Amino acid sequence: MRFLLGLQYFASKKGVGSTKNGRDSESKRLGAKKSDGQFTNAGSIIYRQRGTKIHPGLNVGRGGDDTLFALISGIVKYEKFGKNRTRVSVIPN
């Protein structure tokens, strides 16, 4: 006589699936690099941005990536203009 036993083995550990999360891009360090009233040298970055959140004023240049930089050495001055726009200028001292 032959007996066939139907044995079934169950997992002793739960199977762990992979996830598609768990990565992020490096931060771009955008924002103000010089604050109002602070001294800056010519060529120094004043504000890093995407688009023109802050507009260039007197003695301030705008780079290809919309970064604002000082054209001369002086004091940084942020000012409101228009309805809801801001510009940054460098005042020579």
Swiss-Prot record:
<dbReference type="InterPro" id="IPR018261">
    <property type="entry name" value="Ribosomal_bL27_CS"/>
</dbReference>
<dbReference type="GO" id="GO:0003735">
    <property type="term" value="F:structural constituent of ribosome"/>
</dbReference>
<feature type="region of interest" description="Disordered">
    <location>
        <begin position="14"/>
        <end position="36"/>
    </location>
</feature>
<protein>
    <recommendedName>
        <fullName>Large ribosomal subunit protein bL27</fullName>
    </recommendedName>
</protein>
<feature type="compositionally biased region" description="Basic and acidic residues">
    <location>
        <begin position="21"/>
        <end position="36"/>
    </location>
</feature>
<comment type="similarity">
    <text>Belongs to the bacterial ribosomal protein bL27 family.</text>
</comment>
<dbReference type="Pfam" id="PF01016">
    <property type="entry name" value="Ribosomal_L27"/>
</dbReference>
<keyword id="KW-0689">Ribosomal protein</keyword>
<dbReference type="GO" id="GO:0006412">
    <property type="term" value="P:translation"/>
</dbReference>
<dbReference type="InterPro" id="IPR001684">
    <property type="entry name" value="Ribosomal_bL27"/>
</dbReference>
<dbReference type="GO" id="GO:0022625">
    <property type="term" value="C:cytosolic large ribosomal subunit"/>
</dbReference>
<keyword id="KW-0687">Ribonucleoprotein</keyword>
<feature type="propeptide">
    <location>
        <begin position="1"/>
        <end position="10"/>
    </location>
</feature>
